[in-house]
């Protein structure tokens, strides 16, 4: 719902404030490339944001832990005592003896919600008490409890969900407006002959008397009544609302209450997924109940105390496009427990998985997701330090999440710390970081440019035919990789911006995200 405020036609039927063509249609002729980068003349001001946020107030090792605070509970703490009834939004299987299992729709009284992520609750149906994940419930009869309400979700993520294969025209969701506080957006999947599958977004405005409307002609006393009416009558919308957009259950925040430093015995390593210089990655089970990914580090890879300190910061970084850190085994050998991602690393996915068959629109969308996660890391004054396709994980429906953020600076191995050693990822590293150890969010931007080449070449090693030492020398002399085969020049221009010699001349991730999200913007008919 970016764009102008709602305009009305003379017949007062609502126009969507933005509509978007499917990224996955076979006919690419309908998509026009974003005008933001044309040839070498770059107009960064075509976006309202500044492209160059220098390393303002950034510590060399990412933000200090004081810049993070525990995520507050979204509901007032006066609930302690069980006055408000909460309803389950999803099914949940207990993972420990202290948890409650429940089904979607079950009602609870909250006994204690001061912990934030896990609340002590009593099931009204069974009378049993136990802990429940707070992001699985909402106050009964609230907007949050409606299955069609998706809360804080951006326009782009709404489009990704609605355009998933198998969804039909008229499928919809309601979310918070990104641009107008207190307003909502209705996002609907549509189809027409010119554009094929696309998504229309309508702003739902709030009246001073508490009512809601999309067009002033039809006003409703609640959001629920507006949605009910729109399911029966299109009333100027592109299509009447059919079914609610399917969604996946969110990840819980952590494995369970007080399950952060966990005993090694609680983990069962089942399927080895891969291995690198510093350890292995396994699919496994925690506590006999919960599927997880487990990264095992070789002895001596990093100091347990330093790791635990960094992990405390990492677990507070929460974003849809970051792999959540669930728990740790803090004695050597260190284990890191995270969400399990079904399709493995982006590198393997591109080389050997379904990624081999992806076309440019899907690859650009994956890049946009990674930029979204990195823009969050940028906002939090953190630094990744090892951004590359091997450290991105892929889930169902081409969802991408960033893994291993912040770990690289803790590695003690001499072959790595020398920065020219065999284990150091020179080909992904900005020259000022490789030569002088100057890691900033701007060196991450350089690495992102290299990751873009991995995406468009389906996992080819950067600088083909060159060894590490050669790469360092050539890049210092001004050499940059040429435009990969089949890659549009405008995307190569973005790569070259990421590889500017002066870190402050490289764009921000905020800019990169908006550039990639709008890369295939449909040409709108005049009058929109």
Curated annotation (Swiss-Prot):
Residues 1-35 are annotated as: Disordered. It comes from the Viruses. The active site is at 386 (proton acceptor). It catalyses: L-tyrosyl-[protein] + ATP = O-phospho-L-tyrosyl-[protein] + ADP + H(+). Residues 18-29 have a biased composition (Low complexity). Its EC number is 2.7.10.2. Residues 148-245 form the SH2 domain. Keywords: ATP-binding, Kinase, Nucleotide-binding, Oncogene, Phosphoprotein, SH2 domain, SH3 domain, Transferase, Tyrosine-protein kinase. The keyword Cell wall biogenesis/degradation does not apply. ATP binds at residues 273-281, 295. Pfam families: PK_Tyr_Ser-Thr, SH2, SH3_1. Residues 1-12 have a biased composition (Basic and acidic residues). GO terms for molecular function: ATP binding; non-membrane spanning protein tyrosine kinase activity. PROSITE patterns: PROTEIN_KINASE_ATP (PS00107), PROTEIN_KINASE_DOM (PS50011), PROTEIN_KINASE_TYR (PS00109), SH2 (PS50001), SH3 (PS50002). CDD domains: SH2_Src_family, SH3_Yes. InterPro entries: Kinase-like_dom_sf, Non-receptor_tyrosine_kinases, Prot_kinase_dom, Protein_kinase_ATP_BS, Ser-Thr/Tyr_kinase_cat_dom, SH2, SH2_dom_sf, SH3-like_dom_sf. Belongs to the protein kinase superfamily. Tyr protein kinase family. SRC subfamily. This is Tyrosine-protein kinase transforming protein Yes. It comes from Y73 avian sarcoma virus (Y73SV).
């Amino acid at each position: 719902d970016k764009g102008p405020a709602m305009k009305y036609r003379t017949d007062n039927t609502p126009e969507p404030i933005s509509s978007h063509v499917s990224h996955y249609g076979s006919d690419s002729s309908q998509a026009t490339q974003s005008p933001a980068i044309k040839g070498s003349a770059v107009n960064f001001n075509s976006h309202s944001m500044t492209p160059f946020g220098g390393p303002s107030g950034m510590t060399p090792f990412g933000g200090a832990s004081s810049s993070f605070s525990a995520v507050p509970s979204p509901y007032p703490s006066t609930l302690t005592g069980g006055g408000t009834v909460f309803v389950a939004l999803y099914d949940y299987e207990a993972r420990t003896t202290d948890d409650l299992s429940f089904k979607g729709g079950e009602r609870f009284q909250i006994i204690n919600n001061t912990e934030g992520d896990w609340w002590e609750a009593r099931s009204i149906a069974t009378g049993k008490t136990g802990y429940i994940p707070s992001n699985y419930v909402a106050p009964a009869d609230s907007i949050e409890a409606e299955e069609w309400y998706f809360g804080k979700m951006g326009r782009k993520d709404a489009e990704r969900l609605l355009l998933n294969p198998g969804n039909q025209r008229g499928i919809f969701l309601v979310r918070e407006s990104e641009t107008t506080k207190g307003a909502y957006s209705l996002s609907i999947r549509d189809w027409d002959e010119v554009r094929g599958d696309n998504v229309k977004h309508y702003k739902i405005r709030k009246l001073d008397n508490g009512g809601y409307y999309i067009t002033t002609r039809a006003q409703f006393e609640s959001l629920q009544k507006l949605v009910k009416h729109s399911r029966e009558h299109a009333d100027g919308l592109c299509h009447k609302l059919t079914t609610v957009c399917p969604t996946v259950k969110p990840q819980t925040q952590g494995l369970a209450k007080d399950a952060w430093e966990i005993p090694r015995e609680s983990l069962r390593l089942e399927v080895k997924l891969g291995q690198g210089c510093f350890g292995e990655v396994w699919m496994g089970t925690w506590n006999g109940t919960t599927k997880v990914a487990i990264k095992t580090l070789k002895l001596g890879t990093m100091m347990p105390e330093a790791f635990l300190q960094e992990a405390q910061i990492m677990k507070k970084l929460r974003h849809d496009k970051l792999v959540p850190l669930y728990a740790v085994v803090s004695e050597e050998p260190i284990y890191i427990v995270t969400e399990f991602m079904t399709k493995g690393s982006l590198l393997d996915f591109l080389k050997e998985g379904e990624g081999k068959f992806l076309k440019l629109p899907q690859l650009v969308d994956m890049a946009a997701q990674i930029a979204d996660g990195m823009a969050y890391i940028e906002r939090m004054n953190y630094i990744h330090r090892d951004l590359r396709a091997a450290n991105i994980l892929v889930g169902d429906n081409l969802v991408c999440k960033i893994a291993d953020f912040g770990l690289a600076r803790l590695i003690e191995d001499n072959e790595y710390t020398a920065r020219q050693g065999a284990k150091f990822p020179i080909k992904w590293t900005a020259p000022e970081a490789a030569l002088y150890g100057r890691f900033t969010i701007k060196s991450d931007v350089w690495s992102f440019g290299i990751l873009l080449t991995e995406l468009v070449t389906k996992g080819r090693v950067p600088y083909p035919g060159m060894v590490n030492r050669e790469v360092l020398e050539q890049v210092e002399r001004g050499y940059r990789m040429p435009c990969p085969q089949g890659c549009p020049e405008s995307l190569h221009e973005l790569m070259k911006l990421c590889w500017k010699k002066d870190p402050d001349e490289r764009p921000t991730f905020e800019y990169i995200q908006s550039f990639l999200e709008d890369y295939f913007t449909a040409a709108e008919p005049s009058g929109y």
